Amino acid sequence: MLKAVILIGGPQKGTRFRPLSFEVPKPLFPVAGVPMVQHHIEACSKVPNLKEILLIGFYQPNEALNSFLLKAQQEFKVAIRYLQEYSALGTGGGIYHFRDQILSGGPQAFFVMNADVCSEFPLVSMLDFHKQHGGSQSYVILGTTANRTQSLNYGCIVANRDTQEVLHYVEKPGTFVSDIINCGIYLFSPSIFQHIAEVFQQNQQELQLEENSSWQRMEVIRLEQDVFSTLAGRGKLYVYKTEGCWSQIKSAGSAIYASRLYLSQYGTTHPERLASTKEGGPTIRGNVYIHPTANVDPSAVLGPNVSIGMGVTVAAGVRIRESIILHGAVLQDHSCVLNTIVGWDSMVGRWARVEGTPSDPNPNDPYSKIDSETLFRDGKLTPSITILGCNVSIPAEVVILNSIVLPHKELSRSFKNQIIL
């Protein structure tokens, strides 16, 4: 029997995802038409003998989360539960805190994945690899290749070329260590908890030496820095390298890139989700997802990489490319939306142009990853995708370029390279 744990974080995390995370917990943000974490759940449901999925985070349980879990259980026919941490305990602290729930029923192994990654999730291949490399006494990290410069932004893995054993692990090193990076998806045997317990006891001893220490800090354990670095070179930790697409979803801009990766996967996994040009329907270019309840005028041109949410209205002559249009938004006649996320119930006026700058990886480098740009560079806003928060109104015939508009704003003129508070 197998289980899966998905680490979904909490409201204090994912701040780079604002203003989109104001309205909905980041793991429920729609990427390629379905909530981000649903891609993980679907991948888990395809693993034979996987009986339960546990979501661990420190969001307060709310209606959106509860109804999503209920729908997902019915759709994927697998038990799904949410376990709430009392505070942010780190990637290792969360699973250690809920170790009894994870181990109940006696799973032989369990997956642990971060909710903010986009991947093909080669879980069955990881399972086969795990059986060949030590089984119950070994642990597997999913790895991929990055270029030398960008590898410094991730956990770097030095592995034995023949056996794939992890010899050395460094989280975000200061200088180049390895071009194999950690994808944030793991397969553990239950014995991993012995190693996490060692870190817990070590934290306990260190805190006893400090006078004003808080007991909560004892439970804050990071898998990457505290556990993997000590397990490396001990014959227990292995890396399974994937050639498939992979990306982090840290900033709102990376959601558009992740949407592109998932839409391209739909060609083989869910062809029914992709729209096509039909007589009397809109012109579709490339991969496009349109929710069945959306109302799209036949003269509109959509794609590539466009995701249209529930109840969206796309009027005559509208052009949309490389964008996510969320629930209830209205795009009026002849508006143009490029490299933009249009928030829930927002309105783009007639002949208005809303455009951003894509933050894509370098297309000439096969190992390039998406850069997590800082919001400001040299005192100026870094050009990135345009984001309209929830319930934003853009008047007719204006241009909004490389800007972030916070929720409930009614704009009256054009803006360029600004954050509109």
From Swiss-Prot:
**What's a single GO MF annotation on this record?**
GTP binding
Report the EC code(s) recorded for this entry. Answer: 2.7.7.13
Gene Ontology BP term (one):
GDP-mannose biosynthetic process
Query: One Pfam family this chain carries?
Result: GMPPB_C
CDD domains documented for this protein: M1P_guanylylT_A_like_N (cd06428)
Provide a GO CC annotation, any one.
cytoplasm
Q: Which Gene3D superfamilies match?
A: Hexapeptide repeat proteins (2.160.10.10), Spore Coat Polysaccharide Biosynthesis Protein SpsA, Chain A (3.90.550.10)
User: Record keywords: Transferase included?
Assistant: yes
What does it catalyze? alpha-D-mannose 1-phosphate + GTP + H(+) = GDP-alpha-D-mannose + diphosphate
Cited InterPro entries: GMPPB_C (IPR056729), Hexapep_transf_CS (IPR018357), Mannose-1P_guanyltransferase (IPR050486), NTP_transferase_dom (IPR005835), Nucleotide-diphossugar_trans (IPR029044)
- Name the pathway: Nucleotide-sugar biosynthesis; GDP-alpha-D-mannose biosynthesis; GDP-alpha-D-mannose from alpha-D-mannose 1-phosphate (GTP route): step 1/1
Which keywords label this protein?
Answer: GTP-binding, Nucleotide-binding, Nucleotidyltransferase, Transferase
Tell me the domain of life. Answer: Eukaryota
* Residues forming coiled coils: none
The entry assigns this protein to a family as follows: Belongs to the transferase hexapeptide repeat family.
Name this polypeptide is given = Mannose-1-phosphate guanyltransferase alpha-A
